[in-house]
Amino acid sequence: HDVVRFISAPVTMIGPGWVGSAATHLFLAAPRERRVCLPNTRFLIHQPSGGAGGQATDIAIQAQEIIKARLRIAHEIARETGKPIDEVMADIERDRWLSAEEAVEYGLISRIIERKTELRKAD
């Protein structure tokens, strides 16, 4: 995610059929006008998950890191979609699947394309 924003070359993200979980976070690194998908693409947003093991203190540390990651991801989704943070937090509480059309409405992508020729020259 940070590397996509760090490089100077313009990056266009194209959803090829399925953009889910951590891939959605990477997808949001590109500016909205450079986020597109194909018609049958499905998107999945949700809170992070993880496993923990070891001593109780280690488990508590890992749980806190997952909570921090959840907030960081929610803030990123809110910033990139324009959705209120409370709405995003509710949306990622469980798996939330979106069709290509729903992804446009949600603000994950700018538009749906069917052919490479539909990419703008500026993209």
Question: How does the language model describe each region?
Answer:
Residues H1-A22, L28-D123:
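N-terminal organellar transit peptides
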